[in-house]
Amino acid sequence: MYYGFDIGGTKIALGVFDSGRQLQWEKRVPTPRDSYDAFLDAVCELVAEADQRFGCKGSVGIGIPGMPETEDGKLYAANVPAASGKPLRADLSARLDRDVRLDNDANCFALSEAWDDEFTQYPLVMGLILGTGVGGGLVFNGKPITGKSYITGEFGHMRLPVDALTMMGLDFPLRRCGCGQHGCIENYLSGRGFAWLYQHYYHQPLQAPEIIALYDQGDEQARAHVERYLDLLAVSLGNILTIVDPDLVVIGGGLSNFPAITTQLADRLPCHLLPVARVPRIERARHGDAGGMRGAAFLHLTD
């Protein structure tokens, strides 16, 4: 059996998958915020419960935000303070007496989608998350591409391209990002960015679901806003797709529930790509909240 953990700031979610990659059991517990020992105990107790339930010693994979394992062997994850700065993989491997594999949660999302039965035909899969932030991951021939610092796929911290400033106006504000830079596309293309753009142009503080509801009702202002957002998304993706050239782009995160994102994006891409480039297939993520657990479990299927 394959155990996949999706660990965030508020919850530790475990999914148990069989050899057919089907979910057999799942359980969630709160994430301890202050004690590393309590954090380790929470993970180990879930593993012990799964081992007993299924009568086996399952493999363990973990998806977690941040940098799962740097050169010093430690995890760096601001959202998981109890474990940040600790040698999480080594400590869990020792306590559980098995090989524990860690990866960035966005990479696990991409891996989950790349291993979907419908998508395994595609050699190079790009996962794109449009949620609270903007992130993603790359999977080539069924294996995640992590990079030296586990930041492959941090698309949200690419800067706005010149064409975006031409489109939006040269006085368009380059917002300061949490990473310390200015003009990162995450500040405009995330769910929060979607709402910020609306307020910037129309001076109304609406949240993304409210704007989308107006769009669905035919509101002209909301429709103009969505057109602008999709144009900005397309021009920003142009640079990424030119570098990566994926066969498939799978979009997850809260904004992926808005059908216009996946149905209208492809037609806007050709003018931002090389003339010889082929627009990749663009699909909404298939596995929703289970994606992180799936991808983490499948880290042991990539050998």
From Swiss-Prot:
Pathway: Cell wall biogenesis; peptidoglycan recycling. Belongs to the ROK (NagC/XylR) family. NagK subfamily. It holds the Pfam family ROK. This is N-acetyl-D-glucosamine kinase. HAMAP family: GlcNAc_kinase. It catalyses: N-acetyl-D-glucosamine + ATP = N-acetyl-D-glucosamine 6-phosphate + ADP + H(+). It comes from Shigella flexneri. CDD domains: ASKHA_NBD_ROK_NAGK.
